[in-house]
Amino acid sequence: MASLESSMEAHLQLYEIFLTAAKPMALQAAVLLNIPDIIGSENQLSMEEIASHISASTNKPVHIDYLSRIMRLLASIGVFTEENTVDNRGIPQLKYGPTGLSKLLANNEAQQSCAPTLLFLNQNIMAQAYQFLHDTVIDGSQAFTKANGMNLFEYNSKNPEANRIFNEAMTAQTSSVMASVLKAYGGFKSFKSVVDVGGGAGSAISTIVNEYPHIHGINFDLPHVVRTAAPAKGVQHVEGNMFEKIPSADAVFMKRILHDWDDEHCLKILKNSYDAIPEDGKILIVDAVIDKEKGTKRQVGLMSDLLMMAGCIGGKERTEEEFKDLFHKAGFKSYSIIEIPFYHALIEVSK
Protein backbone atom coordinates (compact mmCIF):
# COMPACT_ATOMS: atom_id res chain seq x y z
CA MET A 1 0.00 0.00 0.00
CA ALA A 2 2.82 2.37 0.88
CA SER A 3 4.47 1.81 -2.50
CA LEU A 4 1.15 2.44 -4.30
CA GLU A 5 0.64 5.69 -2.39
CA SER A 6 4.20 6.70 -3.19
CA SER A 7 3.66 5.88 -6.86
CA MET A 8 0.45 7.90 -7.04
CA GLU A 9 2.13 10.85 -5.32
CA ALA A 10 4.85 10.67 -7.96
CA HIS A 11 2.17 10.60 -10.67
CA LEU A 12 0.57 13.67 -9.14
CA GLN A 13 3.89 15.52 -9.08
CA LEU A 14 4.50 14.64 -12.72
CA TYR A 15 1.06 15.81 -13.79
CA GLU A 16 1.61 19.08 -11.98
CA ILE A 17 4.70 19.54 -14.16
CA PHE A 18 2.91 18.37 -17.33
CA LEU A 19 0.09 20.87 -16.83
CA THR A 20 2.21 23.81 -15.67
CA ALA A 21 1.72 25.64 -18.99
CA ALA A 22 -1.89 26.26 -17.95
CA LYS A 23 -0.69 28.78 -15.35
CA PRO A 24 1.00 31.36 -17.62
CA MET A 25 -1.68 30.90 -20.28
CA ALA A 26 -4.46 31.57 -17.75
CA LEU A 27 -2.45 34.55 -16.55
CA GLN A 28 -2.18 35.82 -20.11
CA ALA A 29 -5.93 35.48 -20.60
CA ALA A 30 -6.51 37.54 -17.45
CA VAL A 31 -4.10 40.24 -18.62
CA LEU A 32 -5.64 40.41 -22.11
CA LEU A 33 -9.07 40.70 -20.48
CA ASN A 34 -7.66 43.50 -18.28
CA ILE A 35 -8.71 41.72 -15.08
CA PRO A 36 -5.77 42.91 -12.90
CA ASP A 37 -6.81 46.50 -13.69
CA ILE A 38 -10.52 45.76 -13.25
CA ILE A 39 -9.90 44.42 -9.75
CA GLY A 40 -7.29 47.09 -9.08
CA SER A 41 -5.60 47.47 -5.71
CA GLU A 42 -8.60 47.31 -3.37
CA ASN A 43 -11.73 45.99 -5.09
CA GLN A 44 -13.48 42.77 -4.11
CA LEU A 45 -15.59 41.86 -7.13
CA SER A 46 -18.02 39.07 -7.94
CA MET A 47 -17.75 37.11 -11.17
CA GLU A 48 -20.74 39.01 -12.55
CA GLU A 49 -19.09 42.35 -11.76
CA ILE A 50 -15.83 41.31 -13.43
CA ALA A 51 -17.76 40.03 -16.45
CA SER A 52 -19.69 43.30 -16.68
CA HIS A 53 -16.46 45.30 -16.87
CA ILE A 54 -15.05 42.98 -19.55
CA SER A 55 -18.26 43.16 -21.57
CA ALA A 56 -18.30 46.96 -21.36
CA SER A 57 -14.73 47.27 -22.64
CA THR A 58 -15.03 44.65 -25.41
CA ASN A 59 -18.68 45.30 -26.34
CA LYS A 60 -19.18 41.54 -26.37
CA PRO A 61 -21.00 39.11 -24.08
CA VAL A 62 -18.90 37.15 -21.59
CA HIS A 63 -19.12 33.41 -20.92
CA ILE A 64 -19.06 33.54 -17.13
CA ASP A 65 -18.49 29.80 -16.73
CA TYR A 66 -15.24 29.95 -18.71
CA LEU A 67 -14.17 33.12 -16.91
CA SER A 68 -14.83 31.55 -13.51
CA ARG A 69 -12.63 28.56 -14.35
CA ILE A 70 -9.73 30.83 -15.25
CA MET A 71 -10.19 32.87 -12.08
CA ARG A 72 -10.48 29.75 -9.95
CA LEU A 73 -7.07 28.51 -11.13
CA LEU A 74 -5.41 31.90 -10.72
CA ALA A 75 -6.78 32.22 -7.20
CA SER A 76 -5.45 28.76 -6.36
CA ILE A 77 -1.90 29.86 -7.22
CA GLY A 78 -2.15 33.16 -5.36
CA VAL A 79 -2.69 35.64 -8.18
CA PHE A 80 -6.07 36.74 -6.80
CA THR A 81 -7.84 36.22 -3.49
CA GLU A 82 -11.06 34.18 -3.50
CA GLU A 83 -13.66 34.68 -0.76
CA ASN A 84 -17.03 33.02 -0.15
CA THR A 85 -19.69 35.69 0.47
CA VAL A 86 -23.44 36.18 0.01
CA ASP A 87 -25.12 38.79 -2.14
CA ASN A 88 -27.88 41.16 -0.97
CA ARG A 89 -30.43 38.40 -1.62
CA GLY A 90 -28.59 35.96 0.60
CA ILE A 91 -27.34 33.89 -2.34
CA PRO A 92 -23.77 32.50 -1.97
CA GLN A 93 -21.20 33.99 -4.32
CA LEU A 94 -17.45 34.18 -4.76
CA LYS A 95 -15.61 37.47 -4.73
CA TYR A 96 -12.13 38.02 -6.10
CA GLY A 97 -9.63 40.55 -4.84
CA PRO A 98 -6.07 41.73 -5.48
CA THR A 99 -2.79 40.29 -4.25
CA GLY A 100 0.80 41.44 -4.57
CA LEU A 101 1.02 39.36 -7.74
CA SER A 102 -2.04 40.84 -9.44
CA LYS A 103 -0.89 44.37 -8.58
CA LEU A 104 2.36 43.69 -10.45
CA LEU A 105 0.31 42.87 -13.55
CA ALA A 106 -1.87 45.99 -13.43
CA ASN A 107 -1.08 49.25 -15.17
CA ASN A 108 -0.38 52.01 -12.68
CA GLU A 109 1.91 54.99 -12.29
CA ALA A 110 3.58 53.73 -9.11
CA GLN A 111 5.40 50.84 -10.77
CA GLN A 112 6.05 49.26 -14.14
CA SER A 113 3.71 46.39 -14.96
CA CYS A 114 5.17 42.90 -15.43
CA ALA A 115 2.48 42.15 -18.02
CA PRO A 116 4.69 42.94 -21.06
CA THR A 117 7.22 40.32 -19.90
CA LEU A 118 4.45 37.73 -19.61
CA LEU A 119 3.16 38.53 -23.11
CA PHE A 120 6.68 38.29 -24.55
CA LEU A 121 7.43 34.93 -22.96
CA ASN A 122 4.03 33.51 -23.96
CA GLN A 123 4.40 34.28 -27.67
CA ASN A 124 4.08 31.35 -30.08
CA ILE A 125 7.60 32.02 -31.35
CA MET A 126 8.96 31.39 -27.86
CA ALA A 127 6.79 28.36 -27.14
CA GLN A 128 7.76 26.77 -30.45
CA ALA A 129 11.46 27.09 -29.64
CA TYR A 130 11.09 24.77 -26.65
CA GLN A 131 9.96 22.02 -29.04
CA PHE A 132 13.54 21.72 -30.29
CA LEU A 133 15.50 21.49 -27.03
CA HIS A 134 16.23 17.81 -27.70
CA ASP A 135 17.81 18.74 -31.05
CA THR A 136 20.02 21.25 -29.25
CA VAL A 137 21.34 18.40 -27.09
CA ILE A 138 22.04 16.16 -30.10
CA ASP A 139 23.46 18.55 -32.68
CA GLY A 140 24.05 21.84 -30.85
CA SER A 141 21.55 23.65 -33.05
CA GLN A 142 19.77 26.80 -31.91
CA ALA A 143 16.18 25.98 -30.95
CA PHE A 144 14.62 29.36 -31.78
CA THR A 145 16.22 29.34 -35.23
CA LYS A 146 14.96 25.83 -35.94
CA ALA A 147 11.46 26.83 -34.91
CA ASN A 148 11.29 30.21 -36.64
CA GLY A 149 13.85 30.15 -39.45
CA MET A 150 16.10 32.83 -37.95
CA ASN A 151 17.44 33.86 -34.55
CA LEU A 152 15.47 36.04 -32.15
CA PHE A 153 17.27 39.29 -32.95
CA GLU A 154 16.93 38.77 -36.71
CA TYR A 155 13.26 37.93 -36.21
CA ASN A 156 12.68 41.13 -34.25
CA SER A 157 14.47 43.21 -36.88
CA LYS A 158 12.11 41.88 -39.58
CA ASN A 159 8.88 41.88 -37.54
CA PRO A 160 7.91 45.28 -36.07
CA GLU A 161 5.19 43.82 -33.83
CA ALA A 162 7.57 41.24 -32.34
CA ASN A 163 10.16 43.99 -31.89
CA ARG A 164 7.57 46.14 -30.07
CA ILE A 165 6.62 43.28 -27.73
CA PHE A 166 10.30 42.54 -27.03
CA ASN A 167 11.15 46.19 -26.30
CA GLU A 168 8.13 46.62 -24.03
CA ALA A 169 9.16 43.52 -22.08
CA MET A 170 12.73 44.76 -21.71
CA THR A 171 11.49 48.18 -20.56
CA ALA A 172 9.18 46.53 -18.03
CA GLN A 173 12.04 44.48 -16.58
CA THR A 174 14.30 47.52 -16.52
CA SER A 175 12.08 49.62 -14.28
CA SER A 176 12.04 47.25 -11.31
CA VAL A 177 15.64 46.09 -11.68
CA MET A 178 17.07 49.60 -12.04
CA ALA A 179 15.42 50.79 -8.84
CA SER A 180 17.31 48.03 -7.01
CA VAL A 181 20.56 48.80 -8.84
CA LEU A 182 20.48 52.49 -7.95
CA LYS A 183 19.72 51.68 -4.32
CA ALA A 184 22.55 49.14 -4.05
CA TYR A 185 25.29 50.92 -6.02
CA GLY A 186 26.53 54.44 -5.36
CA GLY A 187 29.47 54.31 -7.75
CA PHE A 188 27.63 56.16 -10.51
CA LYS A 189 28.40 59.46 -8.78
CA SER A 190 32.07 59.16 -9.81
CA PHE A 191 31.36 58.70 -13.53
CA LYS A 192 31.07 61.53 -16.05
CA SER A 193 29.85 59.24 -18.82
CA VAL A 194 28.14 55.84 -18.99
CA VAL A 195 27.37 53.77 -22.08
CA ASP A 196 24.52 51.27 -21.85
CA VAL A 197 25.41 48.42 -24.21
CA GLY A 198 22.31 46.84 -25.69
CA GLY A 199 20.26 49.56 -24.05
CA GLY A 200 17.15 49.04 -26.17
CA ALA A 201 14.71 51.93 -25.88
CA GLY A 202 17.05 53.68 -23.44
CA SER A 203 15.05 53.24 -20.26
CA ALA A 204 17.98 52.00 -18.13
CA ILE A 205 20.41 54.76 -19.06
CA SER A 206 17.62 57.35 -18.71
CA THR A 207 16.99 56.10 -15.17
CA ILE A 208 20.70 56.45 -14.35
CA VAL A 209 20.91 59.96 -15.83
CA ASN A 210 17.75 61.08 -14.04
CA GLU A 211 19.32 60.03 -10.74
CA TYR A 212 22.77 61.46 -11.64
CA PRO A 213 22.17 64.42 -14.01
CA HIS A 214 25.90 65.15 -14.33
CA ILE A 215 26.35 61.90 -16.31
CA HIS A 216 26.40 61.95 -20.10
CA GLY A 217 24.43 58.85 -21.02
CA ILE A 218 24.92 56.86 -24.21
CA ASN A 219 22.27 54.38 -25.28
CA PHE A 220 24.04 51.94 -27.62
CA ASP A 221 22.18 49.32 -29.65
CA LEU A 222 21.49 47.98 -33.14
CA PRO A 223 20.07 50.39 -35.74
CA HIS A 224 16.54 48.89 -35.82
CA VAL A 225 16.38 49.19 -32.03
CA VAL A 226 17.75 52.72 -31.71
CA ARG A 227 15.36 53.96 -34.39
CA THR A 228 12.42 53.30 -32.04
CA ALA A 229 14.03 54.98 -29.00
CA ALA A 230 12.41 58.21 -27.86
CA PRO A 231 14.56 61.30 -27.17
CA ALA A 232 15.61 61.57 -23.53
CA LYS A 233 17.30 64.42 -21.67
CA GLY A 234 20.99 63.76 -21.12
CA VAL A 235 20.97 60.63 -23.30
CA GLN A 236 22.58 60.22 -26.71
CA HIS A 237 21.26 57.35 -28.84
CA VAL A 238 24.07 55.68 -30.80
CA GLU A 239 23.63 52.82 -33.23
CA GLY A 240 26.29 50.19 -33.77
CA ASN A 241 27.40 46.64 -33.07
CA MET A 242 28.86 45.63 -29.71
CA PHE A 243 30.88 42.87 -31.39
CA GLU A 244 32.75 45.48 -33.44
CA LYS A 245 33.27 48.50 -31.18
CA ILE A 246 31.69 50.06 -28.09
CA PRO A 247 31.63 53.86 -27.57
CA SER A 248 34.12 55.16 -25.02
CA ALA A 249 32.88 56.09 -21.54
CA ASP A 250 33.95 56.04 -17.89
CA ALA A 251 31.73 53.02 -17.34
CA VAL A 252 30.12 50.37 -19.52
CA PHE A 253 26.72 49.22 -18.27
CA MET A 254 25.12 45.97 -19.46
CA LYS A 255 21.76 44.70 -18.24
CA ARG A 256 20.89 41.13 -19.20
CA ILE A 257 23.17 41.14 -22.23
CA LEU A 258 25.84 38.52 -21.56
CA HIS A 259 23.27 35.82 -20.84
CA ASP A 260 22.14 36.07 -24.49
CA TRP A 261 25.47 34.75 -25.77
CA ASP A 262 27.96 31.90 -25.58
CA ASP A 263 31.40 32.37 -24.03
CA GLU A 264 33.09 33.24 -27.33
CA HIS A 265 30.68 36.08 -28.05
CA CYS A 266 30.79 37.25 -24.42
CA LEU A 267 34.57 37.52 -24.60
CA LYS A 268 34.27 39.79 -27.65
CA ILE A 269 31.80 42.00 -25.79
CA LEU A 270 33.99 42.10 -22.68
CA LYS A 271 37.19 42.83 -24.61
CA ASN A 272 35.47 45.65 -26.51
CA SER A 273 34.20 46.93 -23.16
CA TYR A 274 37.75 46.79 -21.79
CA ASP A 275 38.92 48.97 -24.69
CA ALA A 276 36.05 51.43 -24.17
CA ILE A 277 36.91 52.45 -20.59
CA PRO A 278 39.92 54.23 -19.02
CA GLU A 279 42.28 52.49 -16.60
CA ASP A 280 40.10 53.41 -13.64
CA GLY A 281 36.87 52.69 -15.50
CA LYS A 282 34.31 50.06 -14.58
CA ILE A 283 32.16 47.46 -16.29
CA LEU A 284 28.78 47.11 -14.58
CA ILE A 285 26.89 43.92 -15.37
CA VAL A 286 23.35 43.16 -14.29
CA ASP A 287 22.65 39.49 -14.88
CA ALA A 288 21.60 36.35 -13.12
CA VAL A 289 24.26 34.63 -11.05
CA ILE A 290 22.93 31.12 -10.48
CA ASP A 291 22.38 30.67 -6.77
CA LYS A 292 24.15 27.76 -5.07
CA GLU A 293 21.42 27.23 -2.47
CA LYS A 294 18.23 25.35 -3.31
CA GLY A 295 15.14 27.54 -3.43
CA THR A 296 13.02 29.76 -5.64
CA LYS A 297 15.89 32.05 -6.63
CA ARG A 298 17.98 29.12 -7.88
CA GLN A 299 15.01 27.51 -9.65
CA VAL A 300 14.09 30.74 -11.44
CA GLY A 301 17.72 31.11 -12.49
CA LEU A 302 17.78 27.57 -13.87
CA MET A 303 14.50 28.05 -15.74
CA SER A 304 15.83 31.30 -17.18
CA ASP A 305 18.94 29.38 -18.23
CA LEU A 306 16.77 27.00 -20.25
CA LEU A 307 14.96 29.97 -21.79
CA MET A 308 18.34 31.30 -22.91
CA MET A 309 19.25 27.88 -24.28
CA ALA A 310 16.04 27.80 -26.33
CA GLY A 311 15.88 31.43 -27.35
CA CYS A 312 19.44 32.63 -27.94
CA ILE A 313 22.59 31.61 -29.78
CA GLY A 314 24.50 29.80 -27.05
CA GLY A 315 22.77 31.91 -24.41
CA LYS A 316 23.06 30.81 -20.79
CA GLU A 317 22.81 31.98 -17.20
CA ARG A 318 26.13 31.62 -15.40
CA THR A 319 27.56 30.75 -12.02
CA GLU A 320 30.04 33.04 -10.29
CA GLU A 321 32.89 30.75 -11.34
CA GLU A 322 31.85 30.98 -14.99
CA PHE A 323 31.76 34.78 -14.81
CA LYS A 324 35.15 34.84 -13.07
CA ASP A 325 36.67 32.77 -15.88
CA LEU A 326 35.27 35.13 -18.54
CA PHE A 327 36.59 38.23 -16.75
CA HIS A 328 40.06 36.71 -16.42
CA LYS A 329 40.20 35.75 -20.11
CA ALA A 330 39.08 39.26 -21.12
CA GLY A 331 41.97 40.81 -19.17
CA PHE A 332 40.17 42.17 -16.12
CA LYS A 333 41.92 41.93 -12.75
CA SER A 334 39.09 42.00 -10.23
CA TYR A 335 35.34 41.96 -9.73
CA SER A 336 32.81 42.21 -6.93
CA ILE A 337 29.24 40.95 -6.76
CA ILE A 338 26.58 43.16 -5.22
CA GLU A 339 23.38 41.32 -4.36
CA ILE A 340 20.10 42.92 -5.42
CA PRO A 341 16.55 41.58 -5.04
CA PHE A 342 15.06 39.20 -7.60
CA TYR A 343 17.41 36.63 -9.13
CA HIS A 344 19.88 39.13 -10.59
CA ALA A 345 23.08 40.55 -9.21
CA LEU A 346 25.16 43.61 -10.04
CA ILE A 347 28.76 42.74 -10.91
CA GLU A 348 31.36 45.52 -10.85
CA VAL A 349 34.42 44.61 -12.94
CA SER A 350 37.73 46.51 -12.85
CA LYS A 351 40.84 46.59 -15.05
Where are these regions (language model features)?
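A short glycine-rich, Lys/Arg-flanked "PGG" loop and its adjoining helix->strand segment in the class I
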Residues: 267-279
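Short beta-strand "wing" residues that participate in macromolecule-binding interfaces
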Residues: 81-82, 98, 285, 334-337
